[in-house]
């Protein structure tokens, strides 16, 4: 069922009269995409316990294990509730990291997205030329995953801040079009 929900959210299939758009700009507007992302975040919690054990990560920490590229395509799952990012290769959890998402007045959008563009160093045009190392944009409004201050609580203007070393590694294994699931 989980795989069906994820596939529907990515392919733009219509179910029970609700359209699920594959367009990243509208993905956050669909209930199905938000539910698929929330389900992916819930499953990631379970997978993390199985892969890395129960010890919680402190802000700025991450775990990464070697998983062969033959295991499948990459996807990123963001849990806003847990302030965590997860990288999968196929159905195998590769990495887990703490994040800092958007604060209450500038929330990170939830839903199913894909990486639209990447740049190793970007400077915010909106927020005082702030550096955004290893930026991976998934929202046309300029929301991205990037390296930045990571207090372990929502503190950004909507972006997903990652620890520097994790952001760099993640940048090297994702491509334009890599799915990004952002949920509770």
Which functions belong to the PLM regions below?
Residues 2-134, 141-184:
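N-terminal pre-domains immediately preceding structured catalytic cores
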């Amino acid at each position: 069922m989980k795989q069906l929900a994820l596939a529907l959210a990515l392919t733009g299939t219509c179910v029970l009269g609700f359209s699920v758009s594959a367009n990243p700009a509208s993905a956050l507007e669909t209930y199905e995409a938000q539910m698929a992302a929330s389900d992916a975040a819930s499953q990631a919690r379970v997978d993390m316990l199985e892969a890395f054990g129960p010890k919680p990560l402190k802000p700025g920490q991450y775990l990464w294990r070697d998983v062969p590229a033959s295991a499948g395509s990459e996807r990123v799952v963001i849990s806003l509730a847990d302030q965590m990012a997860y990288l999968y290769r196929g159905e195998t959890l590769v990495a887990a990291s703490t994040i800092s998402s958007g604060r209450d007045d500038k929330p990170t959008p939830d839903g199913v997205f894909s990486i639209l563009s990447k740049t190793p160093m970007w400077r915010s045009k909106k927020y005082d030329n702030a550096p955004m190392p290893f930026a991976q944009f998934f929202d046309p409004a300029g929301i991205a995953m990037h390296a930045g201050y990571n207090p372990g609580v929502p503190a950004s203007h909507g972006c997903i801040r990652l620890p520097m070393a994790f952001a760099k590694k993640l940048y090297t294994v994702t491509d334009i079009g890599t799915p990004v699931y952002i949920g509770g």
